[in-house]
A protein has these predicted regions:
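Conserved catalytic region of serine esterases and O-acyltransferases that act on ester linkages
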Residues: 1-224
């Protein structure tokens, strides 16, 4: 669970809150505002098919098979005792959705909304980590090539023309090597590996700079 909050609009009070902090709760007529600081971020489900190893499906497609959202990715937001009508939900002045008082009374899962600021923050972290993974994979393919083919030839970390020539002998017979060969040709150069390592370090540092939840201004405004 990411967080859970339940607010009584009529009494302008927080009924329950879990793994979050609610402050500056104010009611102005039928409208409601408060500051919301969750102690965790929602898990951003990638809706883009990455096609790795022939895979054509996205993470979000998997939600049809497992109850991940219901059991793990819950950012519950409930407001009871609102005047009957439709309400515009904004977070940090960003429009999220128009919701009925009935739906708000039942509660909604904010983790289902990819347009919330907290979801967008989590998505940035996801993309940075995916980039880190892609660079790290180059090292794995380089080492796989070294230990799967060159070690038995007495050419472990030789990284020279003799090693290249030996790999070329294996290329017609091994499809995995054909997929990794271009990365080996690049990674055999220590200068390139150093650049990749520094890039990964920079990515990780950026992730840790932006991965802390921040306080958001939540507003419910009656629209009809």
């Amino acid at each position: 669970e990411v967080s859970s909050v339940s607010i009584d609009a009529y009494h302008s009070s927080v009924i329950t809150h879990k793994n979050c902090k609610i402050s500056k709760l104010k009611k102005n007529g039928a409208d409601l505002t408060f500051d919301y600081l969750a102690y965790a971020l929602p898990y951003p489900l990638d809706s883009i098919s990455r096609s790795g190893w022939g895979n054509k499906r996205s993470q979000r497609d998997a939600m049809q098979l497992v109850p991940f959202m219901e059991e793990f990715n819950q950012e519950r937001f409930q407001v009871t005792n609102l005047e009957k009508g439709m309400y515009r939900l904004t977070i940090d002045n960003q429009f999220i959705d128009n919701l009925s008082s009935e739906k708000l009374a039942n509660g909604v899962n904010l983790a289902d909304y990819p347009n919330t600021p907290q979801y967008q923050q989590a998505a940035k972290i996801m993309y940075l980590n995916e980039e880190r993974f892609e660079v790290e994979k180059r090292f794995r393919e380089y080492l796989w090539t070294e230990y799967s083919f060159l070690k038995k030839e007495g050419l472990l970390f030789a990284d020279d023309q003799k090693a290249i020539d030996k790999l070329k002998e294996y290329l017609p017979k091994d499809g995995f090597l054909r997929m990794s060969y271009d990365w080996y040709i690049k990674a055999m150069n220590p200068e390139i590996r150093e650049v990749w390592s520094n890039y990964m370090k920079s990515l990780v540092e950026t992730i840790y700079k932006i991965n802390k939840p921040v306080t958001h201004k939540v507003r419910l405004v009656r629209v009809e």
